[in-house]
Amino acid sequence: MPNVSVTSNTRFGKSVIVRPGTTIGHDNIIGAHTSITAGASIGSCINIGEGSFIGLKACIREYLTLGKYSMAAMGAVIVKDIGEGELWGGNPAKLMRIAKWKEVAST
């Protein structure tokens, strides 16, 4: 599983990290300083805000928006939009907490 698969018309911001085994669909926008961990599966037409974190083997359904500094926990199945600074986890994913801006500023 050492490969990353990215299909057409996906745009990456500066300093994006994509780990092995990740699949990324078409027509996505991935914001600067985002980290996508191993085995994540990202659908198509998704807008991921800057500074976001996609956990190990998380799945994100197509046509969604993840706000700046949002987080998808390990194994999360994201089927709804995520707001800025929100942490979602589970299957289907639910809001677990909202980051305090002091926490975001320290990352």
Regions found by a protein language model. Name each.
Residues 91-107:
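Terminal amphipathic alpha-helical/low-complexity segments used for targeting or macromolecular assembly
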Residues 1-89, 93-96:
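Structural signal for interior beta-strand "rungs" in well-ordered beta-sheet cores
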